[in-house]
């Protein structure tokens, strides 16, 4: 080493005795550096106590040359040590090395600019961060604390003292002439270029980048110490090729994914989204590409750090000269556990070699940094949970109330990405394989065409066709339900996939290669379930409306029954439904148990804060669901209850209506006789009623509709006794009452159009019908009085029904009498006020003080908002009625700018169905109960299979 001549440390003004003592220590340090050059490279132990906090970290002794402007700081550190030791002098000879404490990211960049001596930029960083004389004057270490010499404040930890002194230095710097205010942002990140004014903020930002990357250049003995990390200055970092995932866009905070084009406002969700494009597993023979600029590569791609962290590592050669820093960036995407072979390589018997020690140290440090990042992520989520903040998915932006649901959702993204990668790989077989079988197939095709005279589309011989047909017949005979499956497109796709696989990889035995098909399907059932679950979650979470409709309906098949949970929302001009879960019903299930099951399933797909309207049947108690949102009753179930309560044998016997009981029995016998099924005579309506409609009513209406055909049939069969016992007059009167009821049920169960706005008009229409028929004499009058009582008791009209009726521009307030107009308008305004907070765009962050100030002026603003909402409702009601039946969603899409609040309310309420049961519920319940009785699948697998059946196709 060469000693600089004429170097003098700055002296402190007004310090006589301490100045002489500092000069003696400085001369002693210079002599020790000269002697270290003669004595040899063996290090001499030295003690350095910077602070109580740094003392717990790993100490690495680095031989280096110390510039003169650094000597003064070493002197006051030695003085503090001597003062703490009670004036006891140190050893006779000053050590030739300087102990640099490394072991945390906070030690890589200090306030005064010192960097580890292995870093080639230590001098430049020092020259940038060394300020005025304030730092040298400020420190007074006494009685275990650091005292500021400027203002007298005391600090226990050295880092806190540094931050305080920096404030004095910044104040002096900004008070001078020619100093720009932008110089306060002096801490610049060398990874992404962001600038920070305060060191603590800069340090937290560096924690997101910092991770040790072990360089593989050179021999093991030439490798640098794995803990020798330096901070690379911004102006001295070599230009590198852009990373595969980088910030694209202006400086306004727009981050665009270059794979799928999604845009993010914040960098962290963008990073998490980009990580999802990474392959889940790395091929065994994969090696990272070499960097053309730095020539460095990642030694172990399976143990590459997370893309959240990027590290800069410096190296020194054996000659002691400072080599240029090489910034090593690992291009792998996800942190993966190394395979067993690599784990054994890391634990080689030759653990005493420099290479094994360096590798072990590197792995230890990487694990520590990864663990620190994971703990930081968990603490962040824990704090957000304590503050009642939702967990947000960085890939799609969906929010979850519980952290476990977020983890499961992220695994679904990973499974979806894995499936896309594997499917793409399977669709593109190697070219060599195609060259092997394609010419052969063409040759066989040509031979068959020329020899047997078959067309190119009939290359299979007739004998093979007969064999295939025989196998198909065996499958059909084994299960009659396979008749529609074999001719379906999914079975054809399966057969084509088997043929293509055999063509690619040669003829093979399906049983030997694929094994049991049921086992194969169940093995991949969770992966397929997660893929479809991600799509359903994204569809429900990205809903432009601020609410959904949820139906929980029980369907009975014989003695068994099950619950089906379905979510509805408006997507464009259509209503989209998603079956979320299927659960077997039990007699012991109460309303609270069903409610808990519904809430648990919904928490996996949507946030609990989302506005929800529940539609349940008569078996589910509405009291439990009313706590979570508005709860309505299925309109078909309500009308069915009306009919059953009136036409039940117990009620008719109590009212002495024996002729009605006899009529119902005769109609049921006629409809159930051999050859007189419903399919024989047809039905009056093309659209079938929902599965929760009463079958007794259908029998009566069927006999009335096809009375002439039934009489002709029985006259030929010479069985006129049943026809003679039929009361034709009473049958006609009952049909006149029940036909409008069934027609209303069919209208309310329409699956392609909004139906909630029809509930109140249906109630008014049926009430008028029963009132008019009640004035007649005889049995019909008694029945109509019973129907009126049952209608008021079972067919409830809720405020949501009234609001939905107003949202129909063809009806508005026309179906109801004028004295109810003000009541319905007030209900509309109340519902708008309840959900208007959800419509407002929330700010990213609002301080508590600002919220407190805004609370004082909330009352006048709320009154103004209520007035505007009521004026909007009156303006809408003054518009003329539509003469033709409009498409409601298309109408509200056109008037969104004119009636903003009503339009948002319409896209929520009009998507809620009036009837909870659908036409496909019966088939789904039959299959679910069949699986349950035969014990083919577990309840969990059965639920996943039903979910796939409903949402995948």
From Swiss-Prot:
| Source superkingdom | Eukaryota
Instruction: Please list the residues that carry the modification N-acetylmethionine.
Output: 1
A single Gene Ontology MF term assigned here is: zinc ion binding
Q: Where is this region: Disordered?
A: 1-56, 283-305, 337-390, 419-461
Enumerate composition-biased segments (Polar residues).
339-354, 419-428, 441-458
**Cross-link type Glycyl lysine isopeptide (Lys-Gly) (interchain with G-Cter in SUMO2), residue numbers:** 63, 81, 238, 436
> Has UniProt tagged this entry with the keyword Metal-binding?
yes
Q: Which UniProt keywords apply?
A: Acetylation, Chromosome, DNA-binding, Isopeptide bond, Metal-binding, Nucleus, Repeat, Transcription, Transcription regulation, Ubl conjugation, Zinc, Zinc-finger
What role does it play? Answer: Regulates UHRF2 function as a specific 5-hydroxymethylcytosine (5hmC) reader by regulating its chromatin localization.
**Protein name per the record:** Zinc finger protein 618
């Amino acid at each position: 080493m060469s000693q600089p001549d004429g170097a003098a440390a700055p002296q402190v003004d007004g310090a006589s005795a301490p100045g002489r003592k500092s000069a003696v220590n400085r001369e002693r340090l210079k002599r020790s550096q000269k002697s270290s050059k003669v004595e040899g490279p063996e290090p001499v132990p030295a003690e350095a106590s910077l602070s109580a906090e740094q003392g717990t970290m790993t100490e690495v002794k680095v031989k280096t040359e110390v510039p003169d402007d650094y000597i003064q700081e070493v002197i006051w550190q030695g003085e503090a040590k001597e003062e703490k030791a009670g004036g006891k002098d140190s050893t006779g000879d000053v050590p030739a090395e300087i102990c640099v404490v490394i072991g945390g990211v906070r030690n890589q960049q200090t306030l005064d600019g010192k960097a580890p001596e292995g870093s080639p930029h230590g001098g430049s960083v020092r020259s940038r961060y060394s300020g005025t004389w304030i730092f040298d004057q400020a420190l007074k270490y006494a009685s275990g604390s650091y005292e500021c010499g400027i203002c007298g404040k005391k600090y226990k930890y050295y880092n806190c003292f540094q931050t305080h002194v920096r404030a004095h230095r910044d104040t002096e710097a900004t008070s001078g002439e020619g100093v720009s205010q932008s110089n306060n942002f002096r801490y610049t990140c060398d990874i992404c270029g962001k600038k920070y004014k305060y060191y603590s903020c800069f340090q937290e930002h560096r924690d997101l980048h910092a991770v040790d990357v072990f360089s593989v250049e050179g021999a093991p003995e030439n490798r640098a110490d794995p803990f020798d990390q330096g901070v690379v200055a911004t102006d001295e970092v070599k230009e590198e090729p852009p990373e595969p995932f980088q910030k694209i866009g202006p400086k306004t905070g727009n981050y665009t994914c270059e794979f799928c084009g999604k845009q993010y406002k914040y960098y962290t969700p963008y990073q998490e989204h980009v990580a999802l494009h990474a392959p889940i597993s790395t091929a065994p023979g994969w090696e990272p590409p070499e960097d053309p600029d730095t020539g460095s590569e990642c030694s172990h791609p399976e143990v590459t750090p997370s893309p959240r962290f990027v590290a800069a590592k410096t190296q020194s050669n054996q000659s002691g000269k400072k080599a240029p820093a090489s910034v090593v960036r690992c291009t792998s995407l996800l942190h993966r556990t190394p395979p067993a072979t690599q784990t054994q390589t890391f634990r080689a018997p030759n653990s005493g070699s420099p290479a094994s020690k360096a590798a072990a140290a590197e792995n230890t440090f990487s694990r520590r940094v990864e663990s620190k990042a994971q703990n930081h992520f968990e603490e962040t989520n824990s704090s957000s949970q304590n503050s009642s903040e939702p967990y947000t998915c960085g890939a799609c932006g969906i929010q979850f109330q519980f952290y476990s649901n977020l983890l499961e959702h992220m695994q679904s993204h990973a499974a979806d990405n894995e499936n896309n990668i594997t499917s793409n790989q399977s669709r593109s077989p190697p070219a060599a394989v195609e060259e092997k079988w394609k010419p052969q197939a063409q040759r066989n095709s040509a031979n068959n065409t020329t020899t047997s005279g078959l067309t190119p589309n009939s290359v299979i011989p007739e004998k093979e066709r007969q064999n295939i047909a025989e196998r198909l017949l065996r499958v059909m005979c084994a299960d009659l339900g396979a008749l529609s499956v074999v001719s379906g497109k999914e079975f054809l796709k399966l057969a084509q996939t088997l043929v293509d696989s055999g063509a690619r990889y040669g003829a093979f035995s399906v049983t030997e290669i694929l094994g049991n098909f049921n086992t194969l399907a169940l093995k991949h059932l969770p992966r397929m379930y997660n893929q479809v679950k991600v799509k359903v979650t994204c569809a429900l979470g990205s809903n432009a409306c601020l609410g959904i409709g949820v139906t929980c309906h029980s369907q009975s098949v014989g003695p068994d029954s099950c619950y089906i949970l379905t979510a509805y929302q408006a997507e464009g001009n259509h209503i989209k439904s998603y079956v979320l879960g299927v659960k077997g019903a039990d007699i012991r299930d109460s309303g609270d148990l069903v409610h808990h099951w519904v809430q648990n399933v919904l928490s996996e797909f949507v946030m609990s804060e989302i506005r929800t309207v529940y539609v349940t049947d008569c078996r589910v108690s509405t009291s439990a669901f009313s706590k979570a949102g508005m709860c309505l009753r299925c309109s078909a179930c309500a009308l069915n209850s009306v009919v059953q309560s009136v036409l039940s044998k117990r009620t008719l016997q109590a009212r002495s209506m024996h002729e009605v009981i006899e009529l119902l029995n005769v109609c049921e016998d006629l409809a159930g006789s051999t050859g007189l099924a419903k399919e024989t005579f047809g039905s009056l309506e093309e659209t079938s009623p929902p599965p929760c409609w009463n079958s007794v009513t259908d029998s009566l209406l069927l006999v009335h509709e096809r009375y002439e055909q039934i009489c002709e049939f029985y006259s030929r069969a010479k069985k006129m006794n049943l026809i003679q016992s039929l009361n034709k007059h009473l049958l006609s009167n009952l049909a006149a009452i029940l036909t409008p009821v069934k027609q209303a049920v069919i209208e309310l169960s329409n699956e392609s159009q909004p139906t909630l706005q029809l509930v109140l008009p249906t109630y008014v229409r049926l009430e008028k019908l029963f009132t008019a028929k009640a004035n007649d004499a005889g049995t019909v009058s008694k029945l109509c009085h019973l129907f009126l009582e049952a209608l008021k008791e079972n067919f409830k009209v809720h405020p949501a029904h009234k609001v939905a009726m107003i949202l129909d521009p063809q009806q508005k307030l026309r179906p109801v009498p004028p004295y109810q107009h003000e009541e319905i308008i007030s209900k509309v305004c109340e519902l708008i006020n309840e959900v208007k907070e959800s419509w407002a765009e929330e700010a990213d962050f609002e301080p508590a003080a600002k919220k407190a100030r805004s609370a004082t002026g909330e009352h006048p603003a709320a009154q103004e908002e209520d007035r505007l909402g009521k004026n909007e409702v009156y303006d809408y009601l003054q518009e003329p009625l539509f003469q033709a039946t409009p498409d409601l969603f298309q109408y509200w899409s056109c008037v969104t700018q004119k009636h903003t609040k009503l339009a948002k309310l319409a896209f929520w309420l009009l998507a809620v169905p009036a009837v909870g049961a659908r036409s496909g519920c019966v088939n789904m319940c039959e299959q679910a109960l069949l699986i349950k009785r035969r014990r083919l699948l577990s309840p969990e697998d059965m639920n996943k299979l039903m979910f796939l059946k409903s949402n995948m196709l």
